[in-house]
Each structure stands twice: as structure tokens, then as C-alpha cells.
Regions:
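Conserved catalytic core of the tyrosine transesterase superfamily
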Residues: 1-243
């Protein structure tokens, strides 16, 4: 933070300001943005550093608070547009996972490919985080009405309806196939040893099919979540419903 504070003081000297006040501090941050071209995150760090420094001066030296009104402001970082996959990229990703299932050369590969195909479908169809997919249990899914209970951040639960009959069929197929892997847990998705599939394993499954389908090489599993939300909005869903 020392460099941030020194930067402010150096700039004040160069501008010949008589004193440091709310207006001059605002001019400094405008300078950082317009003249220096700093990103919002870098500006926010300087903002926090100077706010702490000025509060220190206020407490230690009883500086008049009128000069530090800016420290109570909210500094907003503009959000970047969410990164998504195109419709064609999503089709490629799902098609590759389905093709690998169809081309399975052994029972062992068939079991794993069934699971992987189902994971890719669910990540997009429901807009799941990979942590949510990893934490799913067998009894979270109700095949009769094709609903699934999701446990999100902060222990929040939401009951989702799987609208695609094809995805429901693939999920039912996986549940049957899962029994062949001698499960040792109630987890919906398991590894070859029968244990719960980890978040890192689900990440690797996504990256495998990402590379095989020749889509955006920088795509992460979260792209599917953003793509799901984007499609909902494009189809008329309200922003609050999507959130």
C-alpha cells in the first residue's frame, strides 16, 4: 500500500494542489482511469489503501473529516460480460461426449463414458456449478417427475425440473450403469473405485471433451453455466428467475 500512497502524494505535488480534499482526491482517481488507463481492480486497490491511510490520519491526528468523505463511497468494479459458448460449441461438446459413449470398446469404458456423457448434459441443461454436480446424491434425483435437488452455495437448496426427456433418459441410463461399478457411497456420480467423483475429476472430464470438440480452448466448466443463463434470458426468462 505504501506505493499507492506515495503515488497519490507525488501526483498532488505535481498538480500544485493547495490541500488534499474530496475534490482533489476524486481528480486523482479520474486521472488513474483516464490518463493511466488502469483497470478497475487496480484502482480499487489504491482506493482501499488511501482510505485506510486517511482514516489512520483522522484517528491519530484528528484531521477534519470533511476531507475524507470519499472513503465512505462505494467503489464499483464494472462487471465483464460473462463468458459463454456458442450454440454450435455446445452442440459439439454434447455430440462428442455422446459419440464416445457410442464408440465404447469395453464395458469399463462404456460405464465411464455413460457417466461422463451424463455429467456434460447436466452441467449445461441445469446450469450447475461443478461443485453442485459433485455433491449430488442418488436420492436427490426423482425419476418419476424428472426433478433433481441441488445444494448450492450457502447451503441453499433448489428443486429443478429437467425439461429435456433425452437428458432424463441418459440420467436413468447412468443410474442403472452405476450399479455395475460397486458403489461405496450414495453419491450420484462415482469414480471407478465406487467413491464420490471429485470436483477436479469433473473439471478434467469437461476439459477432455472441450479439447476433443475443438471449441474455445480457454473454456472452463463455468462457461456452460453462463451459456445456460444466457439461453434462458434469450428465451424470455426474467433476470430474477435466472439469478
Amino acid at each position: 500500500y505504501r506505493c499507492d500512497i506515495n503515488g497519490l502524494l507525488t501526483w498532488f505535488h505535481s498538480q500544485n494542489f493547495a490541500n488534499i480534499n474530496d475534490s482533489s482526491v476524486s481528480s486523482y482517481f479520474l486521472y488513474l482511469q483516464k490518463e493511466c488507463g488502469l483497470q478497475a481492480k487496480s484502482i480499487r486497490r489504491k482506493y482501499v489503501a488511501l482510505g485506510q491511510y486517511f482514516n489512520f490520519l483522522k484517528l491519530e491526528y484528528n484531521i477534519n473529516e470533511i476531507f475524507f468523505r470519499f472513503t465512505s463511497r462505494k467503489f464499483h468494479i464494472p462487471r465483464n460480460l460473462p463468458k459463454t459458448l456458442s450454440n454450435q460449441e455446445i452442440k459439439n461438446l454434447i455430440s462428442v461426449s455422446a459419440a464416445e459413449y457410442q464408440d465404447s470398446t469395453s464395458d469399463y469404458k462404456r460405464r465411464l463414458n455413460t457417466r461422463n456423457m451424463c455429467i456434460i448434459e447436466l452441467l449445461f441443461c441445469l446450469g450447475l456449478r461443478i461443485g453442485e454436480a459433485a455433491s449430488l446424491n442418488l436420492d436427490d434425483y426423482c425419476p418419476e417427475d424428472c426433478t433433481i435437488l441441488i445444494r448450492g452455495k450457502g447451503s441453499r437448496e433448489r428443486l429443478l425440473f429437467i425439461s429435456s426427456p433425452i437428458v432424463c433418459q441418459k440420467l436413468n441410463l447412468w443410474i442403472q450403469t452405476r450399479l455395475e461399478m460397486s458403489p461405496t457411497t450414495t453419491a450420484l456420480f462415482i469414480n471407478r473405485y465406487g467413491d464420490r467423483l471429485s470436483i477436479y475429476s469433473i473439471e478434467n472430464i469437461f476439459y477432455k471433451y472441450r479439447d476433443l470438440s475443438n471449441i474455445n480452448p480457454n473454456a472452463t466448466p463455468h462457461y456452460l453455466r453462463h451459456s445456460f443463463a444466457t439461453q434462458l434470458l434469450n428465451n424470455g426468462a426474467g433476470i430474477r428467475d435466472v439469478q
